[in-house]
Regions:
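Sec-dependent signal peptide cleavage junction
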Residues: 22-38
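N-terminal secretory signal peptides that target proteins for export/translocation
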Residues: 1-5
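Sec-dependent N-terminal signal peptides
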Residues: 7-24
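A surface/extracellular/periplasmic glyco- and lipid-processing/surface-interacting theme
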Residues: 35-78, 83-335
């Protein structure tokens, strides 16, 4: 089992300094071009136009909201605590390049300040249903295009807050109606440098076939599936299956970021301090290595680096990213 203490001991000051220097250079570099036929979010082939910007959809992660629809087709999925109340309930943000091909996504819920800063990294159009008044300064600071509420209501026998979904074609229609561009308006290059990476020779490599993330509300876990070479997503004690086709939700890459937060009020609203630098883990192929992460501005890309300060090479495929509160980081475990 790997602990936060062991990781911090392994990360040298000069590794952090080197990574920060490289990261600042990358964030300030000129916009790169998307590559035709390649999904810049996964490094895999796509039929979507290379210039098509993604959508980021806020998805409820309360047990009552299950099953999730369209989650298995997301290119990148973020999970973070949505509130310090309700046993630190989490919420998901799923990012899709080829969103027109997904039958149904959701159910849709409100956004939080952190989601706005992260969605802005992708120049995505954020789909949500409202949010606390704390979100408005972040929309102003990022200039993020977003669509709030008014999506399809699908009767499922649940309370109204669990019935809103984005169905195929709806995102494109709403984007056009709002006058937003479907093409990138700002593209700072790929989040990840894709390439084959076994991690076998990396510093601090450890076995990671069974992973526990300290989100107490839903007990997020990942189990490495050697036959698919991906990590199967578990919560509430069961494998997460897509409500559309019952496919197990899984990811080639799993990132864990140690990230503290600021409590905004007594109602549990918060914002992660995701602009800065800290430690984390990268998991793929049943192994894990310690990394550092860096984000320098509201809209700047979060970049990941190995302990020697080199930009991390990430295996092509779908990616899950958890922002783990620093006060719980010591409870991250894998074996």
């Amino acid at each position: 089992m790997i602990s936060k203490k062991r990781l911090i001991q392994a990360v040298s000051v000069c590794a952090l300094t080197a990574a920060l220097a490289v990261g600042t250079l990358l964030v300030n570099s000129s916009c790169a071009e998307a590559v035709a036929g390649i999904n810049e979010l996964t490094g895999l082939a796509t039929t979507a136009a290379e210039s098509q910007r993604p959508i980021a959809v806020m998805i409820d992660n309360d047990k009552k909201a299950n099953p999730h629809y369209g989650l298995s087709e997301a290119d990148v999925v973020y999970e973070m605590i949505n509130s310090t109340h309700n046993n630190r309930v989490t919420r998901l943000m799923a990012i899709y390049k080829d969103y027109n091909s997904v039958p149904r996504i959701g159910n849709i819920r409100s956004t939080r300040p952190t989601n706005i800063m992260l969605a802005a990294e992708y120049n995505a159009v954020l789909i949500h249903d409202g949010g606390p008044f704390y979100v408005y300064p972040y929309f102003d600071a990022t200039g993020l295009n977003h669509l709030s509420g008014g999506f399809s209501r699908i009767a499922n026998g649940k309370a109204r807050e669990f019935t809103e979904y984005c169905v195929a074609g709806e995102a494109a229609t709403r984007i056009a109606k709002a006058g937003y561009s479907t093409s990138y308006t700002a593209y700072e290059g790929q989040h990840f440098t894709f390439g084959a990476n076994t991690l076998a020779d990396d510093a601090g490599v450890a076995t990671a076939t069974n992973v526990s993330i300290p989100f107490p509300h839903n007990s997020t876990k990942f189990v490495y599936n050697a036959s698919t070479m991906t990590y199967d997503f578990y919560e509430f004690g069961s494998g997460v299956k897509d409500g559309d086709d019952n496919v197990q939700v899984s990811f080639t890459n799993v990132f864990l970021q140690d990230c503290d937060f600021t409590l905004l009020d007594q109602n549990g609203y918060l914002v992660y301090n995701c602009i800065g630098t800290n430690v984390g883990y990268y998991l793929t192929g049943g192994l894990a290595i310690p990394v550092t992460w860096i984000k320098t501005t509201y809209t700047g890309l979060t970049k990941f680096y190995t302990l020697d300060g080199a930009e991390l090479v990430v295996n092509p495929g779908k990616t899950y990213i958890a922002l783990v509160p620093s006060d719980a980081w010591g409870s991250v475990s894998f074996k």
